[in-house]
Each structure stands twice: as structure tokens, then as C-alpha cells.
Design a protein with these regions (language model features):
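Conserved P-loop
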Residues: 51-117
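Short, Lys/Arg-enriched N-terminal segments with co-localized hydrophobic residues
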Residues: 1-10
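Phosphate-binding/switch loop-helix module in NTP-utilizing enzymes
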Residues: 110-170
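Pre-Walker A adenine-sensing motif
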Residues: 18-32
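Phosphate-binding/switch region of NTP-binding enzymes
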Residues: 177-243
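Pre-Walker A (Motif I) flank of P-loop NTPase domains
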Residues: 34-39, 65
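Conserved glycine(s) of the Walker
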Residues: 48
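The conserved Walker
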Residues: 45
Length: 243
């Protein structure tokens, strides 16, 4: 028996998936990253890195994929608010009404984990993940790490994380905090990724110019596929396609 409520929720999900602007990356319904791969979203503070990651997560959750959101900056309650706000804004933009129960239907596909920056280690993360999976509580397919402290000593930690991602069969998105005054390296990378940029398969930069925020691919996606098309709306932080 298919209940009307369940059918409506499925319709809303499919509608939001089809409206996802990131489909213009040319990968159809597939994720941007493959299992074991790293992606990075680069921007200065306040430009929209967390909002971008949450929208990646919501799109995966709409496809019933399990998302582990690791925050090194914010408590669980604040991360949860990001999801609620951006989901409502996505629905409003799509003129979808009567959304009772839709977000609640998605939440079992998300698990939020928080660490203090100084307390975040790969062995500690692996221990907590092992507890989740061994007890059959949560088996992530996508991992977000918001607030990772990129620096000179962190290549080894990133290499250990990549090995862990490969063993678990997950792909990982990071936020990377950049500074407007910093000059890129000869390879076009920000200094924060100077020693570890080669570990990343996809790198996207949020480029704020005035009131406009463009999404520029630096690696892993053909730039002509999204040339000046994808934006972050500075009012809502929603990704939009102007192609």
C-alpha cells in the first residue's frame, strides 16, 4: 500500500533533485566525487562555505544517501539550523508547499558529529565511526568536514583521512578557509592547500566580488561546463544556475 503522504514526499524529493543547480557540472544524477575521493570548497570567512556543503548534503539526502556532517566550528544545534533554513529556502524557491514531514523524512539520512579543533584526530574519528557502524547506528556514504585546520603540519593527517575514506568507501568534502590578501601558488592553489592540494580530486572556489558570489572550479570539473553560471545567492546562500 502506497500512502498519499509517502507519495507526496517522494514527488517533492524528485522535484528538488531535478532542480539541483549542481547538475550543470555535467554528471547527471551522480555525485561529484567518487568513493575515496576528496573535494574542497574554498572561500574567505562569511562567503558561504558551510551553506554550500549543507546543500551538497541535502541533495545526497534527497537521494537517500547517508551523510556524516563533522563540524569543528559549531555545535549540533547550529548545524541543524543550517539544514532547516536551507531546506526551507530550497522549497520556497521551487514554490513547493505543504512540506510537512519532508525534512523529517530526510533527517535519518544525516548524522552530525562535533569535535573541538584541537581534539580532532584521525584515530579518534575512526573510533567513533567504528562505534556507529558496528552498532548498526549509521553507515555514511558522504562525509563533510567543516572547519578542518589546514596548515603546514596537516598533510600527514589528510593522508590518513584519505586512507580511512578509501577503507570506508566514502567521499569527503572539506571547507577551506582562505584570505583575500593571500596570493595563490604557482599552481593556482591558495596557500592553505600548498602542501596538500594534490590530495584533492575536486576543488571549487567561492569568489565574492561585490554582491556577487561565483562558483569557480579549480580542479576536477571542466571550467567551461560551469563558466560564470553557478552562483551563491548572497541573500539566501542558495546555489543558483544562471546558464
Amino acid at each position: 500500500v502506497i500512502h498519499l503522504r509517502d507519495r507526496n514526499i517522494d514527488m517533492f524529493k524528485k522535484d528538488l533533485i531535478l532542480r539541483n543547480p549542481l547538475r550543470s557540472f555535467g554528471r547527471g544524477g551522480e555525485e561529484i566525487l567518487a568513493a575515496g575521493c576528496f573535494g574542497a570548497v574554498l572561500a574567505p570567512a562569511g562567503v558561504g562555505k558551510t551553506a554550500f556543503l549543507v546543500q551538497l548534503a541535502l541533495n545526497a539526502m534527497l537521494q537517500e544517501k547517508k551523510v556524516l556532517h563533522i563540524s569543528l566550528d559549531e555545535p549540533v544545534t547550529k548545524v541543524s539550523l543550517w539544514y532547516a533554513k536551507l531546506f526551507q529556502d530550497l522549497a520556497d524557491r521551487a514554490n513547493l508547499t505543504r512540506l510537512d514531514g519532508v525534512l523529517e523524512d530526510l533527517l535519518p539520512h544525516r548524522f552530525i558529529m562535533t569535535f573541538k579543533v584541537e581534539g580532532f584526530t584521525v584515530p579518534k574519528l575512526e573510533e567513533r565511526l567504528t562505534d556507529l557502524t558496528a552498532q548498526n547506528i549509521f553507515h555514511p556514504e558522504m562525509v563533510l568536514i567543516d572547519g578542518f585546520p589546514f596548515g603546514e603540519a596537516d598533510r600527514e593527517r589528510l593522508m590518513a583521512l584519505k586512507l580511512l575514506a578509501g577503507r570506508l568507501g566514502v567521499y569527503v568534502w572539506f571547507t577551506v578557509h582562505t584570505h583575500r590578501h593571500e596570493k595563490p601558488t604557482a599552481e593556482g592553489m591558495p596557500p592553505a592547500l600548498a602542501r596538500a592540494g594534490d590530495l584533492f580530486d575536486v576543488i571549487l572556489q567561492l569568489d565574492a566580488r561585490g554582491a556577487d558570489i561565483t562558483i569557480q572550479p579549480l580542479r576536477g570539473i571542466a571550467s567551461d561546463a560551469v563558466e560564470n553560471r553557478l552562483r551563491l545567492d548572497p541573500a539566501t546562500m542558495l546555489i543558483r544556475d544562471e546558464g
